Amino acid sequence: MKEECDILIVSNYYDPELGAAPKRISAMARGFVERGNSVRVLCPMPNYPKGRVFGGYRNKLKVREFIDGVCVDRIFIYPSKSQKPFVRLLSMLSFSISLAFYLPFLNVNRTKLILIQSPPLFVSFTAVFLSNLFFKRKICLNVSDLWPQSAVELNVLKPG
């Protein structure tokens, strides 16, 4: 598969992780491929739901693999399931920082659409900002969850 792609998806979750978000994003990427598009997914090393990088991906800064015709670039994340707000914040910020170093160097000459999955807020903000700054391509921000939930999980807001 070539370096270039028609559609770039930036997501915090992707197969083989468990849960609705990785399954939904994976199905969407496969659907784009089935319709004749080349697709690249940029995501962190798989770590959800346990907050530990899965075996085979540990101690790596970048892994490229092909799953069902989709080019998947996995980059560094500091994963955590800690209940401490600072540690959770650090975990969320780590993928955004990795994006800041990786995204500007992608070859997007042929890319027609950049689809950014949100939440988390930091990832979507970083991806939208850098995509607008460097690429000038159509951006679709897919908000699949309530943003206040992120604040509840960080203990910044209380439920209810």
Positions of predicted regions on the chain:
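Active-site loop signature of alpha/beta-hydrolase-fold enzymes
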Residues: 16, 47, 80, 146-149
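An aromatic- and histidine-rich active-site surface loop
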Residues: 88-103, 111-135, 141-144, 149-150
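N-terminal subdomain of nucleotide-sugar transferases
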Residues: 1-68
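Hydrophobic residues in well-ordered beta-strands that form the structural core
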Residues: 9, 41, 74, 141-143
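Glycine-centered short loops/turns at secondary-structure junctions
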Residues: 36, 135-136
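Active-site-proximal region of nucleotide-activated glycan assembly enzymes
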Residues: 137, 156-160
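A conserved catalytic-core segment of Leloir-type glycosyltransferases
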Residues: 43-106
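Short acidic, glycine/proline-rich loop/turn micro-motifs
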Residues: 83-87, 151-157
